[in-house]
């Protein structure tokens, strides 16, 4: 049996402490999600949408972060439009998570008929050519599903992740992610294990939109504002000798289908400077997210790092004060 952690890979392992009564609530939540995942999507999606919107009204801090992000990224939209985007975001989140749980429980053959790939020929050609690949994946709510589907088809996948605060949720979530194989690398272990996996032929999964602070980031345009963006994908392409391929999943709660959009490799970044790389990374996020903003995790502190002299928007008391 594999240990929880080897030289480069994180492997979730059940701990006997998870049986303690303090975790019973978490297990109840896991059981509820499993039951929901086994419910036909035409029944579960409307219910999950209503529950998600309701939770979004209760989660005032998360809602505030989302509204702040949207107000800076889409100032041309009315307040009502931004509120509607946030409502739809909270509706989409549990729907996408339920599809991920369904995939883990029932297997890919049960959800493949509801998955549409746009640009699948790009992936197939790279597989035929035995190329090394790093997917550039904006942080959408269905972000894990494409990697799980590719892993279920025999493609070796590797991704980095942050641990969940609740150890039971962390164990279950990462067990689901590894359901069909692949490697998980904890961000706390640095980027070297991820690089090692890609060099060994695993296709990498890289989320470009987290705020890593000002030290190694570039301040570049992001929708109507700017963002501190780490130009890591360019460096990863070089050290891994890999091609960077933008990918984004979109879950439609009305049709109960997942569309996975794949764009052409970003080969233009091989000779680009850091500023250009960072801007191109944000540009790909804009192309994917702009038409379907409800798919994106606007609750993150995407715009935390600001230029000298500017106040972090989430600390500004004039922006959406919590009542």
Spans of features found by a protein language model:
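Short Gly/charged-rich anion-binding patches and loops
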Residues: 31, 65, 121, 145, ...
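Non-catalytic C-terminal accessory region of glycerolipid acyltransferases
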Residues: 2-19, 83-87, 124-128, 152, ...
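Catalytic core of membrane glycerolipid acyltransferases/transacylases, capturing the structured
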Residues: 129-188, 214-221, 225, 255
């Amino acid at each position: 049996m594999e240990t929880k952690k080897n030289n480069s890979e994180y492997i979730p392992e059940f701990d006997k402490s998870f049986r303690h009564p303090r975790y019973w609530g978490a297990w109840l939540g896991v059981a509820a999600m499993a039951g929901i995942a086994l419910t036909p999507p035409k029944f579960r999606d409307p219910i999950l949408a209503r529950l998600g919107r309701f939770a979004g009204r209760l989660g005032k801090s998360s809602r505030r972060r989302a509204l702040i992000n949207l107000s800076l990224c889409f100032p041309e939209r009315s307040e009502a439009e931004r509120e509607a985007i946030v409502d739809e975001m909270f509706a989409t989140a549990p729907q996408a998570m339920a599809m991920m749980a369904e995939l883990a429980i029932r297997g890919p053959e049960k959800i493949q008929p509801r998955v549409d790939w746009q640009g699948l020929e790009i992936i197939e050609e790279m597989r035929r050519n035995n190329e090394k690949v790093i997917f550039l994946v904006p942080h959408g709510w269905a972000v894990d599903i494409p990697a799980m589907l590719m892993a279920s088809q025999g493609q070796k996948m590797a991704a980095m992740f942050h641990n969940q605060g609740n150890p039971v949720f962390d164990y279950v979530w990462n067990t689901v992610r590894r359901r069909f194989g692949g490697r998980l690398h904890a961000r706390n272990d640095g980027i070297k294990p991820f690089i090692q996996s890609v060099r060994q032929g695993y296709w990498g999964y890289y989320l470009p939109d987290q705020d890593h602070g000002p030290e190694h980031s570039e301040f570049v345009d992001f929708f109507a504002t700017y963002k501190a963006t780490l130009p890591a994908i360019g460096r990863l392409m070089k050290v891994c000798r890999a091609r960077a391929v933008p990918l984004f999943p979109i879950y439609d709660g009305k049709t109960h289908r997942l569309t996975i959009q794949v764009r052409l490799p970003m080969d233009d970044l091989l000779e680009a400077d850091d500023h250009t790389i960072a801007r191109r990374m944000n540009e790909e996020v804009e192309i994917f997210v702009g038409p379907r903003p409800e798919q994106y995790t606007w609750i993150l502190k995407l715009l935390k790092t600001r230029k000298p002299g500017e106040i972090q928007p989430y600390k500004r008391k004039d922006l959406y004060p919590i009542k």
